[in-house]
Amino acid sequence: MERKEAIRSAYRLTGESSFYDGMITCSTLSGKAVCRLVWAMNKAENDDYLEKALSGIPEHFSGRLLEVPVGTGILTMPVYKTMPEADITCLDYSADMMGQAREKADRLHLKNVTFRQGDVGALPYEDNTFDIVLSLNGFHAFPDKEAAYREVYRVLKPGGTFCGCFYVMGEHKRTDWFVRHVYEKAGFFTPPYETVSGLKARLDGMYTGVDMGNLKSMAWFVCRKAE
């Protein structure tokens, strides 16, 4: 519980600042500086892994999608604008981050997106509920990753898609240093972390048709739950 409160506190500050949006999209001067310094990426590289993580959502998708965590919604609310027939649920542990996402949804007049505060380790949904579960930049923060993996699998329909991206250790020394000495201490990241090989083995053991790769320290993946 202490770690969860540390995470909530860290993301409360983030949710009140536009700095996070600029960093996660690598679109502002400060955001580009962080991308280069911490992640050794430029904007094109940042956009590339995000595009691959989102590639699990088909064009004209009209099913049920769960995004966890939604964060500030900077990466996905514009995408949801193109999916008016979809039934989209956005969940986050941080009410402050989710409040930013809700404001973006309101500005875009999104009528098919609902928001709920909750814990990925105990998702408040029935088994086999969603056609897609999307998780961008979440698993490196989740304090109980095993529970998160189990819950995502549980709420995903047979034949459904699990896709997203998150930090993996061991790919870039400077990034690993910042994660250990800055992001963990601030409450943004929580060990243990996956490696590329460990994540591939995990996804292969749980899902079918695993498409996965990494760009520096960010892994992206698209996989399906067996029918």
Stretch-by-stretch model annotation:
Residues 121-132:
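A short acidic, Gly/Pro-enriched loop at the edge of an enzyme's catalytic core
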Residues 1-59, 78, 180:
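Conserved class I S-adenosyl-L-methionine
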Residues 146-158:
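A short glycine-rich, Lys/Arg-flanked "PGG" loop and its adjoining helix->strand segment in the class I
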Residues 14, 23, 37-39, 43, ...:
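C-terminal alpha-helical "lid/dimerization" subdomain adjacent to the S-adenosyl-L-methionine
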Residues 132-144:
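A short SAM/SAH-binding and catalytic strip from SAM-dependent methyltransferases
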Residues 64-122:
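Class I SAM-dependent methyltransferase SAM/SAH-binding core
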Residues 64, 159-161:
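Short glycine-centered segments of the SAM/dcSAM-binding site in methyltransferase folds
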Residues 221-227:
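C-terminal lobe and adjacent flexible extensions of AdoMet/dcAdoMet transferase-like proteins
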